[in-house]
Amino acid sequence: VISITDGQIFLESDLFFSGMRPAVNVGLSVSRVGGAAQTKAMKKASGSVRIDLAQYREMEVFTQFSSDLDDATKAQLAYGGCLMELLKQPLCHPLTLHQQVITLWTATHKKMVHVDKKNVKKYQMDMLEYFENAYPEIGREIEETKQLSDELGEKILQVADEFKDRAAAM
C-alpha cells in the first residue's frame, strides 16, 4: 500500500510477477485526482476500464475453483484478459495519447476479444500501424483537440472492423 495525499494505491505481487507493471490493484486503489489529470479523450475512452478490470480480477479468482463455465463468464474472462494484456507496456516504449485512446476505445467496445490472449499485443501494434498509415487524420485530431467526439469514436470502430477484416484475410 502506498498512501498519497489524494488517495491510496494498492500494489499486488501477483500482478507484478504476471508481468503487469505497475502492479496496481484497480479494485482497491482510490484517487481523487485521477480523472482530473486525464484529457477528455482519455476519460471517454477509458470509461469502464477500472470497473471491468475489477470485475475480471474477482471473476478470475472465483473461476479458479470451477471447471464448468457458462458462455457469458468465458466472454467476460476473455475480455478482461485482453484488457490486462493491452495495459502491459514494454519499458521505455510509451504509447502516444492517440494510440492509447484508440487502443482503449476499441478494447472497451470489444473489438479485440476475438484475438487469442498471447497475440493481443501484436494485434494492437499492427492495428495502430494500420491507423497511422491509412487514417493518420484520426490520430492528428485526437492529439490536437484532446477530445473524442461521437463521430470520431464511430470512425475508430469502423476502422477497427476494417482492420479486423483485413487481418482475417491475411
Model-derived segments and spans:
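Conserved catalytic/coupling modules of large nucleotide/cofactor-utilizing molecular machines
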Residues: V1-M170
